[in-house]
């Protein structure tokens, strides 16, 4: 199964898409016992891919929780995805996902024309969150601050702050109620940060 997460704007857009030739991936349940691969009568019920944490016996529960944590660590290590844009020489870094990341890219292009170099880190996966990528971008020489731009009231903001861990100031700009942040608003926010406001 594939799950696409999209905001309201992306969900209503249409544009040409090039799909690569389909590859039929066969998942070996023995290699990924955590994956929900379906179950049919006659299969071993213990291998259904159901995540269960209702174990009355504390020792069994402890072993099970250790196994889950090992899975989470493996997923975190191998499944982070993100895009970096215009980070080289950036004075400011924007973090944004979904539609807002597209708008932020337009703002970055226009700010560059005004002599302000801004980069972007766009998480493709929000879990596992690309903490190291955000941290690395923020710690580049010359980066003064990070602006988190979202189409909400900061659902990703805490993760951005955790990634940066106080190394640089983090500011936030967002909108609610289907009101989209504009290129001009993002530019104005970066300019106000540059001016120390």
Question: What are the language-model segments listed below?
Answer:
Residues 1-84:
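Conformationally flexible catalytic loops at phosphate/diphosphate-handling active centers
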Residues 3-6, 120, 148-149, 172:
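General beta-strand structural signal in soluble alpha/beta enzymes
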Residues 9-11, 97-103, 127, 152-156, ...:
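Gly/Ser/Thr-rich loops at beta-strand to alpha-helix junctions
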Residues 13-20, 105-106, 133, 158-161, ...:
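Short acidic, glycine/serine/threonine-rich loops at helix termini
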Residues 64-80, 96-103, 123-130:
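A general structural motif
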Residues 105-137:
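Generic long, charged, amphipathic alpha-helical segments
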Residues 150-197:
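Peripheral docking tails and interdomain loops at the edges
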């Amino acid at each position: 199964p594939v799950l696409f997460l999209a905001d309201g704007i992306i969900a209503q857009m249409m544009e040409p898409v090039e799909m690569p030739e389909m590859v039929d991936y066969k998942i070996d349940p023995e290699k990924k016992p955590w994956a929900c691969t379906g179950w049919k009568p006659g299969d071993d019920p213990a291998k259904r891919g159901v995540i269960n944490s209702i174990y009355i016996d504390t020792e069994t529960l402890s072993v099970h929780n250790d196994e889950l944590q090992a899975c989470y660590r493996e997923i975190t290590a191998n499944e982070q995805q993100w895009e970096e844009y215009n980070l080289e020489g950036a004075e400011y870094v924007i973090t944004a996902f979904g539609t807002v990341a597209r708008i932020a890219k337009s703002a970055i292009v226009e700010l560059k024309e005004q002599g302000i170099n801004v980069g972007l880190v766009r998480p493709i996966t929000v879990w596992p969150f690309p903490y190291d990528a955000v941290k690395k971008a923020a710690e580049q020489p010359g980066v003064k601050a990070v602006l988190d731009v979202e189409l909400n009231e900061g659902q990703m903001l805490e993760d951005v702050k955790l990634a940066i861990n106080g190394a640089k100031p983090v500011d936030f700009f967002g909108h609610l109620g289907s009101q989209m942040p504009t290129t001009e608003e993002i530019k104005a926010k970066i300019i106000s940060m540059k001016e120390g406001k």
